[in-house]
Amino acid sequence: MANDLASELEADSIFMDEHSAGANANHLRALSWAAEQSDRVIIIEEDALPVDGFRDEAQDWLTRFPDNLCSFYLGTGRPPQYQMQIAERLIVADKTRADYITLSRLIHGVCYSVPPEHVHRVL
């Protein structure tokens, strides 16, 4: 599954949880690797379902928001404690014709990108 996704997205690197350390440990490995890269990195879990043209779409968003942590996934059921806030932000975005919402924190680790200058803060 992970290898198929990596191939589909032409990923530069892949981090597999071969020792059952868990998602958090694997995100830490990926973020540590990202901290050593000169280019911005997108971290995506193997169960993500990227849209067609994801690489180009993601690049457009990262160009648009170079200094922001960008999440490319918004769940409609999890985490439950954020659903009301998400709904409120979506209503505001709809009224203002915005094509994005902002939150004060990352609430999903499915697919995200941290600006290179902030990766060490996340670690």
Predicted segments with their positions:
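An acidic/histidine-cluster motif and surrounding catalytic segment
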Residues: 1-44, 48-123
